[in-house]
Amino acid sequence: MKYLIFFLIIISGCAKDFSKNKIQTITNFQAAKVEGNHNVFISNEAFKLVNNITSEDCESWALDLNFDDPIKNSIKNLSDKMFNSYSISKKKLSPKEIENSNFVSQISYEGFSGVSNFKTQRNTGVYEISLKVKVKVENSSKNIVNEISSNMSWEKNIFFDCNLHEGGIYSGQKALDNLMRKVYESTYESIYNITR
């Protein structure tokens, strides 16, 4: 009986739990405040991440990245930091509705997608991730649409504790940080351009 308990303890100690590491919402924005009342629309479409895994090295079977809640919650956090007054709507408003509601602008975030690739080159696992979002800033008479993307990569020797899930979390988090910085810059500049 002692050996059975000892064996179970050893087995459970060796099992990895990949569910603990996940992409986190961005909260630490440095953003200038934008005056006026704005409407923010965040599409409820699911974030589409296409994984192209061509190698079984680095425990690639365990790769499981979820960007849907982190990116949408990051946009909400950005809006809190960026706008003195704003509303989040469940649908896009028409230019006439924007004007009638006295919104300075409507900012729509949609087209959430990403592609990740993993392959082995010689003895190195190579992972690349690209995240994309479409940002449309409009008022009753003008609109500006920007397709924003962020790319990051990660490499590790396949013989030295190579774990794709950990590498994917690391590079995915950096890609999301970079994407949100670009989203802020694009949104701020577009609002300035349509309201001047």
Predicted ranges, named:
Residues 13-78, 192-196:
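A structural "domain/chain start" motif
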Residues 64, 68, 72, 126, ...:
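Solvent-exposed, acidic/flexible segments
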Residues 52-58, 117-120, 160-164:
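Short acidic, glycine/proline-rich loop/turn micro-motifs
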Residues 14-31, 138-196:
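C-terminal/domain-edge helix-coil "capping" segments
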Residues 16-20, 91-149, 156-160:
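Surface-exposed short loop/turn segments
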Residues 82-92:
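Short secondary-structure junctions
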Residues 72, 76-80, 84, 184, ...:
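Generic solvent-exposed, charged/amphipathic alpha-helical segments
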Residues 3-12:
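Sec-dependent N-terminal signal peptides
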